[in-house]
């Protein structure tokens, strides 16, 4: 599952994101880099949950800033 999600993420980063204007993320690391790190660190299920929470925060009413992937326990 993680490999499929990483493949979809790579497709998004190289083919869809440039069509949307490139880097528009309010956070560091960017949402796509965060997603890749979350999937590699936490696997598919928890990684998807972390990605979902991050994307919900990536909107005009949020200040953004530094928001790293949480460490594993």
UniProtKB/Swiss-Prot annotation:
UniProt superkingdom: Bacteria
Compartments where found: Cell inner membrane
Cross-referenced SMART domains: Haemolytic
Pfam families: YidD
Membrane topology, record value: Peripheral membrane protein
InterPro entries linked to this entry: Membr_insert_effic_factor_YidD
Principal localisation: membrane
Coiled-coil regions, chain positions: none
Keywords: Cell inner membrane, Cell membrane, Membrane
Listed GO CC annotations: plasma membrane
Function in brief: Could be involved in insertion of integral membrane proteins into the membrane.
NCBIfam families given in the database record: membrane protein insertion efficiency factor YidD
Family the entry assigns: Belongs to the UPF0161 family.
Record-given protein name: Putative membrane protein insertion efficiency factor
Protein species of origin: Rickettsia bellii (strain RML369-C)
High-level lineage: Bacteria, Pseudomonadati, Pseudomonadota, Alphaproteobacteria, Rickettsiales
């Amino acid at each position: 599952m993680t490999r499929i999600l990483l493949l979809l993420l790579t497709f998004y980063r190289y083919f869809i994101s440039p069509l949307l204007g490139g880097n528009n993320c309010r956070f560091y690391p960017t949402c796509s880099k965060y997603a890749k790190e979350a999937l590699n660190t936490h696997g598919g299920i928890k990684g998807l949950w972390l990605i979902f929470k991050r994307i919900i925060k990536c909107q005009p009413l949020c200040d953004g800033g530094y928001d790293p992937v949480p460490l594993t326990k």
